[in-house]
Amino acid sequence: MIKHFLEDNSDDAELSKFVKDFPGSEPCHPTESKTRVARPQILEPRPQSPDLCDDDVEFRATLWSQPSDSQQYFCPPAPLSPSSRPRSPWGKLDPYDSSEDDKEYVGFATLPNQVHRKSVKKGFDFTLMVAGESGLGKSTLVNSLFLTDLYRDRKLLGAEERIMQTVEITKHAVDIEEKGVRLRLTIVDTPGFGDAVNNTECWRPVAEYIDQQFEQYFRDESGLNRKNIQDNRVHCCLYFISPFGHGLRPLDVEFMKALHQRVNIVPILAKADTLTPSEVDRKKCKIREEIEHFGIKIYQFPDCDSDEDEDFKLQDQALKESIPFAVIGSNTVVEARGRRVRGRLYPWGIVEVENPGHCDFVKLRTMLVRTHMQDLKDVTRETHYENYRAQCIQSMTRLVVKERNRNKLTRESGTDFPIPAVPPGTDPETEKLIREKDEELRRMQEMLHKIQRQMKETH
C-alpha cells in the first residue's frame, strides 16, 4: 500500500502518518480497465532563502515514483493548519490575533482600535469659554494651559475706552497637534464683563451666545447634510472669581445661576499668589458653602467605576476637593534651583505655576485636558443641549397646535381672526421685544415645517 513507495526514513514519513490518520483522505481505486491514472503531486517546502520571511515560503512540486496497479490513490492533504499558516497583515493592529486563539477568537475585541483610528483621523473639537472681570489673568491662564499664544493679535484698550466698553464675545481658534492627535481648540472670551459701573444683566450676551450655538447646531442637525456638522457648542466655562473679598459677589451669583443650566461651569479662584495658603483654604471653603446655599449647579465630576485602580480614585477625590481651583498663570520662564520653570519672581521667592504645592494649575489641567475633557463634551451633548432641544420641540409643537386650532375655527366660522396688533401706547422697548418674539416664533415654525417635509420625503 502506501508503504510500498514511502519509506519510514524518507522526508515524507510524516505525510504518510498524516494521511493515514486524516479522516478525509478516502482511498481512490483505479478503474477495472487499469487505465493509466495521472500521477498525483504533493507540495514539498523548498529550502528557505535568507531573503524570505516565514510568511513567504515557496513550494515546489515533486513527482512520485511509478505506482503499480495494486496501489491505492488518495486525496491531497488538508490545507495548512492555523499554527503554520501566514498571519493576517492586520495582526499588528490586533493584539489578540494569534494562531493559538483562532478557534475561539472572533475579532470584535478590535473595535476599540477601530474607533481609536477613526477618531484620531477625524480629530477632536473643544470649545472653552472664559468669563470674569478684567485683570484676573484669564488670557495668561489659557496660554499656560495649552502652551500656545492665542492672544497675540489682541489690542489693549485705554482707560477711556474701557469706560464705554460693553460686553463682547470674541473667538480665538487654533489647531493643536500632540503625538499625532489633532485638537481644534476654540477659546470664547468675554471682554468687558463686569467692568462697568452698572453690571445689571451683563451676563445676557453670554447666555444669548450659548443659545445661538445650540440653535445653529439644532438647525444643522435637522438639515439634510449632517455629515460635516461643525460643533461650536460651548463645552466648558471657566468662571474667574476675584481673590479680593470674602466670597462670591452678587454678580458672581447672578452669572452662575443664569448659565448653570446652559453650560458646564468650573469656578476658578484667580491670582492665588496674592493669598497665603491658609487664606486660600478659607476662601475655598466659603465659596463652596455659598455655591451650595444659592443652589448653583457647577460641573459635577462623575463617580469612579468600581474596577478603577486606587491611584485613579485618589486622584479623582483630590480633584473634587480642589473646587474652586486656585490657579496662577505665567508665560515667563525663570531660574529656580538650577532649573528653568514657568512662574513669577518676587523679592521673597519664586512662585512656580506647575508646582502642586503652590497652586492648583496642574490639577486644573489634568481635569480639563487629560481626564474629563470627553466627559465635559458628553454632559454638554446629553444634558444641556438636549434640554434646549426639548424646549425647541415643545415650542414648535405648541405653535403647530395653535395654528391648527385657529385654522379649524376659521373654517367653521368662515371668517379670519387677524393677529391682534400691538396695543397703542406701548413703549418702544416692549414693541421691540414683541417683534423679536414674533420673529423667533416664525423661525421655529418654518423649521418645524421643514422637518415635517423631510420626514414625509423619507417615508
UniProtKB/Swiss-Prot annotation:
Subcellular location(s) of the protein: Cytoplasm; Cell projection, Cilium, Flagellum; Cytoplasmic vesicle, Secretory vesicle; Cell projection, Axon
Give the family from UniProt.
Belongs to the TRAFAC class TrmE-Era-EngA-EngB-Septin-like GTPase superfamily. Septin GTPase family.
Q: Name one GO molecular function term.
A: molecular adaptor activity
Q: Where is the Septin-type G domain?
A: 122-395
Which InterPro entries is this protein grouped with? G_SEPTIN_dom, P-loop_NTPase, Septin
**Entry protein name:** Septin-4
Annotated stretches, region: Disordered:
18-52, 70-98, 410-430
| Phosphothreonine PTM positions | T415
> GO BP, one example?
tissue morphogenesis
Q: Which organism does this sequence originate in?
A: Rattus norvegicus (Rat)
The job of this chain, per UniProt, is described as: Filament-forming cytoskeletal GTPase. Pro-apoptotic protein involved in LGR5-positive intestinal stem cell and Paneth cell expansion in the intestines, via its interaction with XIAP. May also play a role in the regulation of cell fate in the intestine. Positive regulator of apoptosis involved in hematopoietic stem cell homeostasis; via its interaction with XIAP. Negative regulator of repair and hair follicle regeneration in response to injury, due to inhibition of hair follicle stem cell proliferation, potentially via its interaction with XIAP.
Question: What is the annotated quaternary arrangement, including any partners?
Answer: Septins polymerize into heterooligomeric protein complexes that form filaments, and can associate with cellular membranes, actin filaments and microtubules. GTPase activity is required for filament formation. Interacts with SEPTIN8. Component of a septin core octameric complex consisting of SEPTIN12, SEPTIN7, SEPTIN6 and SEPTIN2 or SEPTIN4 in the order 12-7-6-2-2-6-7-12 or 12-7-6-4-4-6-7-12. Interacts with SEPTIN14 (via C-terminus). Interacts with DYRK1A. Interacts with SLC6A3/DAT and SNCA/alpha-synuclein. Interacts with STX1A; in the striatum.
Q: Which UniProt keywords apply?
A: Cell cycle, Cell division, Cell projection, Cilium, Coiled coil, Cytoplasm, Cytoplasmic vesicle, Differentiation, Flagellum, GTP-binding, Nucleotide-binding, Phosphoprotein, Spermatogenesis
CC terms in the record's Gene Ontology section: axon; axon terminus; cell division site; cell projection; cytoplasm; dendrite; dopaminergic synapse; microtubule cytoskeleton
Regarding how it is modified after translation, the entry says: Phosphorylated by DYRK1A.
Question: Where are the residues of the annotated region G1 motif?
Answer: 132-139
> Residues where Phosphoserine occurs?
S10, S49, S98, S99, S306, S413
For the region G4 motif, give the residue spans: 270-273
Spell out the PANTHER family in the cross-references.
SEPTIN
